[in-house]
Amino acid sequence: MPQFGRPTTDTTREAWEEDDGTTVDIWDQIDEAVADDLDFIRSAQVPTTDAYVTKLGTLTDPLQSTSHVVRYRYGKDTAAGAQINLVVELRQAYVSEASQGTLIASLTHTDVASGWTAGTFTLSGAEADAITDYTNLYVRITANQI
């Protein structure tokens, strides 16, 4: 049976904010079951490896190494124009930027396009097997202007 680990709390927020500029509990802008491009989070206008980390809701071990998929949407403001690179990571046991836990998998997007793009990466069997605690998973996003 499919499981979905959606954001449940902000763990680290370095210069990230909601689409309206507020900075309290921004995870609730990205926790929907169906993507809503009218509410989102954003990095600083000129990001310098600014990190955002959210804890995912509790999942149970599916007892298989297949069909572990991380899905998200990303884009940039056309007005900003500069090259922005984005790294999306799945981590286990993240505590802080000084103690990032175990990197399970990641994907780098170079020169993010304007507008919204669906992002996804599927864990390999070895990456899925590296997860030992499905209740302690995080998504870490970093944005960097080149």
Task: Cite the ranges covered by each PLM segment.
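Disulfide-rich extracellular domains of secreted proteins
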Residues: 1-146
